[in-house]
Design a protein with these regions (language model features):
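N-terminal "domain-start" segment that seeds a small globular fold
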Residues: 1-15
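Short, internal strand/loop/helix patches
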Residues: 75-119
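Short active-site neighborhood of thiol/selenol oxidoreductases, capturing the structured segment around
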Residues: 13-37, 140
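Thiol-/selenol-based redox modules, centered on thioredoxin-like
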Residues: 109-171
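Structural microenvironment flanking redox-active thiols in thiol-disulfide oxidoreductases
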Residues: 36-81, 91-98
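Loop/turn elements at helix/coil->beta-strand transitions in domains of secreted/extracellular proteins
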Residues: 19-23, 53-57, 83-85, 112
Length: 171
């Protein structure tokens, strides 16, 4: 991605995080109950990424095209929740299409060559207190240790990304 506006008022691109060994890209939004359920877990992951030996970064991207997910609404949400990760808007939806993302939240781990090493759900349930399988953290741990990821894809849990509608009918 290039020049995606962030809630911090800056433009962001892959180059901002390309020095990391791994980048966690999460497609999320303000309006999906599942995405809201994951906000604290995404923030915890971001704080983990900020540790000196983490070797990864977290970037959140909102591709929804509804008023509740406007950049202004995202800025408000980011301030309220004090997000420590870049929260970017994908107004053209080009980035979500390029990744093949269909739900919020949906997680991807990319290596420094931009190869997707994991995609899908962060864990096995939206209810934080009932998590048994931590797919994303397990994949990150394996990658950081130079091991193969055993589970490379899981079905994402969440709401469909709200794509921009194009009128096809012309009278």
């Amino acid at each position: 991605w290039k020049n995606l506006p962030g809630t911090d008022g800056k433009q962001h691109s892959w180059d901002d995080v390309s020095h990391q060994d791994f980048v966690v890209v999460v497609f999320t939004c303000n309006s999906c109950p599942y995405a809201i359920d994951y906000e604290d877990r995404i923030e915890a992951l971001s704080r983990l990424a900020q540790e000196s030996d983490s070797r990864f970064a977290v970037v959140a991207i909102n591709s929804n095209q509804i008023p509740e997910d406007s950049l202004q609404a995202m800025q408000k949400r980011s301030r309220e929740k004090q997000f420590s990760f870049p929260y970017l808007t994908d107004a053209t939806q080009d980035v979500s299409r390029a990744f093949g993302a269909i739900r919020t939240p949906e997680f991807f781990i990319l290596d420094h060559t931009r190869r997707i090493r994991y995609m899908g759900a962060m864990d096995d349930t939206a209810e934080a207190s009932h998590v048994k399988e931590q797919y994303l953290l397990d994949a990150l741990k394996a990658l950081k240790q130079g091991r193969a990821v055993t589970v490379t894809e899981t079905p994402p849990i969440g709401c469909m990304i709200r794509k921009a509608r194009k009128k096809r009918y012309r009278p």
